[in-house]
């Protein structure tokens, strides 16, 4: 299979023989769902990456971020508060799974600027508390801003501040799928 995990491992081994002016680490972003946690655990234990990023890309079996169909299949058929609650429930389980070193784009569910219908601050506090307890990093990811024009450049300001208050390590990320998106919009993020 082209672009398989084996191809990636071969690339890592080849690159580890090279010398770079910066520290280069190799990791993997893994799509997490509570239903696939045991499968992920059985697969991931066979690999040794420098880091593993766990991300939630779907809610109730539907991708929440695909312009072509997410609004039709998910957002227009469900109460936004239920979507947000399911998303953050999955984030909670991702953290508690102990499979990952960091959470990818932990508040990207906001990308379409749809009102959740409830105050997210208790959720932010709960997620921050869990992140601290499980010693997992949280991403301050710029992709919702540059891809979906969300006004938040990275994390919601209140969420970021709550994470900082809880001494949760925050990792800057751009979710680059193309070289041109590496570090995109980092200059707009609040200085740490």
What name fits each language-model region?
Residues 1-7, 75-86, 115-122, 148-155:
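Alpha-helix N-cap and loop-to-helix initiation/capping positions
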Residues 1-64, 69, 74-77, 81-82, ...:
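A metal-dependent hydrolase metal-coordination microenvironment
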Residues 6-9, 13, 85-88, 125, ...:
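Generic alpha-helical structural signal
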Residues 78-116:
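Hydrophobic, aromatic-enriched interface-forming segments
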Residues 27-33, 57-59, 107-111, 141-145, ...:
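Active-site beta-loop-alpha junctions enriched in small/polar residues
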Residues 115-192:
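Charged catalytic cores and adjacent phosphate/nucleic-acid-binding surfaces used
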Residues 24-28, 52-54, 102-104, 138-140, ...:
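Hydrophobic faces of well-ordered beta-strands that scaffold small-molecule active sites
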Residues 9-21, 41-50, 95-99, 127-135, ...:
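Acidic (Asp/Glu)-rich catalytic clusters
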